[in-house]
Amino acid sequence: LNDLLGELNSSHQGFSSFGDEEEVQYAASTMETGILFTDEDPYKVKSIVARSAADMKEVEILPGDELVKVDGIAVDKHTDRSYYFTHPSLDREVKLTFSRKGQPFEVELHPQSFLGDDLYDAWIDDNRRRVTEKSKGRIAYTCMKNMGTQELEHFIVDMTQELNGKDGLILDLRYNTGGNVHDEVLKFLSQRSYLQWKYRGGQLTTQGNFTPADKPIVLLINEQSLSDAEMTSAGFKALKLGKIIGNETYHWIIFTSGAGLVDGSFVRLPSWGCYTLDGKDIEATGVTPDIKVINTFEDKINGRDPQVDKAVEEVLSEIKK
């Protein structure tokens, strides 16, 4: 049925049930540790992902350490590493033995079932460092991973901390998976100064307290900015809040309702289409950037980010005007 729905080429549709046909014959869990290994030697540590299971241990795992045992079983360097970390269910604990300069040491970890959020956060940390270094601290950087209420709260707190004392802003919606808080984000970004006030003997300060639109703003998007990230991007462009840099969005923006069927299954129904003020269907057109910059696979594996670099360049040029 999902294959049939796919032929309609309309996003956010779906069918799910809880019958026997949904059960799989075999399930497996990968025990994620947060340890990244080198490409040249699949058992030699390259780095540790911040805030992951391996980052929480008192015994520090360092780049160059070599994994020699998993739960007491010696690893075979000619065996795919995933063999030792894939089980029918997630283990509560895994014991890893490493060698450092010929000396063995053990680390016990509580493995994770998913590392994606930690990798995303590490990517955000790297982007923020890049922006801070290239702008010499003049530009604030914030990223929204989705358009949910929790991420909205994080965005507002981040803005109150990051934007103060900065001359410009980069908002990153790349890889954003959507939600429904576009209106709140756009309202916050649209705030401009309208008055000044001061306490007796003090200095003049502007009202309101948070006025992002007083400063140059650049929005980053890419081919995996989808759903409500596309609504936010389209609104950002319509309100002329700043330049959009990156690649065209995903073309995946419809709001749905749903219905339960008599057998307990559930179907999602497209209900609200999303259109620009001149009537263009955003699902059909996506949102195109003002300045197109594509990050290649080669950029990624070499630690480059031309989209962020261009955003910094653009904000700095606006600051100088």
Q: Can you say where each PLM-predicted feature lies in the sequence?
A:
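PDZ/PDZ-like peptide-tail recognition elements
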Residues: 3, 7-51, 55-57
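Cleft-lining beta-strand/loop regions that shape enzyme active-site pockets
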Residues: 18-19, 23, 44-57, 68, ...
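Conserved catalytic motifs of ABC-family nucleotide-binding domains
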Residues: 64
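Short, well-structured alpha-helical segments that form the helix of a local strand-helix-strand
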Residues: 1-4, 308
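In a subset of proteins, long, contiguous C-terminal domains/tails are tracked
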Residues: 11, 164-166, 196, 275-321
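Peptidyl-prolyl cis-trans isomerase
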Residues: 60
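C-terminal structured "cap/appendage" subdomains that terminate the fold
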Residues: 241-245, 251-300
